[in-house]
Amino acid sequence: MRTAEELRYLVLAAELEGKRLLAQQLRPLGLTPSQAEVLRGLADHAPLSLNGLGSLLVCESGSSPSRLVDRIVARGLVDRRPGATDGRAVELTLTPEGERLSREVEALEEAMYATIDALAGPDIGVTLDFLRAFIDGSPSGRALARRIALSE
């Protein structure tokens, strides 16, 4: 197998395994990984417009998250209100229940990050540089870059 082919399948397998593990941990909360990403994005950056939220989501990069948001609004986790400066715009914020679940999601994520940190060796920087270069300019790469910039 070529190195590039092996890398492609390793990235795919790691993404699928990470998503599977996260989905398994989120199941008792009644959340999907995409819904959890919305809650965490709003917890960190609310209020956000639908477009503003969409620009930060890796799970929905390049598309509008309106159906995803509709589902969590219906569950009472997110409030959708007219914008403060433009009544035609919509602002999204977490409800108290959404805030509670977001904190639980954050704790699950921290446990997952601790596992990843324990596995990461001294060359992790090289791996991160490669992955950043690989996704640079893509819709998901731009969404991730925006999230990183906002967190700094």
Write out the residue ranges for each language-model feature.
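N-terminal leader segment of winged-helix/HTH proteins
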Residues: 1-29, 77, 91-92, 96
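Helix-turn-helix DNA-binding helix
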Residues: 64-65
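N-terminal helix-turn-helix DNA-binding core of bacterial DNA-binding proteins
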Residues: 20-61
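Residue-level recognition of alpha-helical structural elements
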Residues: 3-7, 61, 120-124
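Charged, amphipathic alpha-helical coiled-coil/dimerization segments
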Residues: 70-129
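Alpha-helical linker/hinge and terminal dimerization helices associated
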Residues: 14, 18, 57, 101-120, ...
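C-terminal regulatory/oligomerization modules of transcriptional regulators
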Residues: 1, 122-152
